[in-house]
UniProtKB/Swiss-Prot annotation:
This is Reactive oxygen species modulator 1. InterPro entries: Romo1/Mgr2. It comes from Homo sapiens. Residues 42-60 are annotated as: Sufficient for antibacterial activity. One of its GO terms (biological process) is defense response to Gram-negative bacterium. Induces production of reactive oxygen species (ROS) which are necessary for cell proliferation. May play a role in inducing oxidative DNA damage and replicative senescence. May play a role in the coordination of mitochondrial morphology and cell proliferation. Has antibacterial activity against a variety of bacteria including S.aureus, P.aeruginosa and M.tuberculosis. Acts by inducing bacterial membrane breakage.
Amino acid sequence: MPVAVGPYGQSQPSCFDRVKMGFVMGCAVGMAAGALFGTFSCLRIGMRGRELMGGIGKTMMQSGGTFGTFMAIGMGIRC
């Protein structure tokens, strides 16, 4: 697929750049959601201190990676 040229001679981002941008945006949104849901679920089962921070971090990484992967796939389909 040829690269489209926008106004003022600017080129559009490549397909790989779009997929990469989708992954980063998905990671950011997924980690924010994971922080909220992870905090709630860890506090609900009674975690405190280091265990709480580990549980929240684990949930943030899992949800960030999952949502980032799906966003990257979605951006790849749109290329």
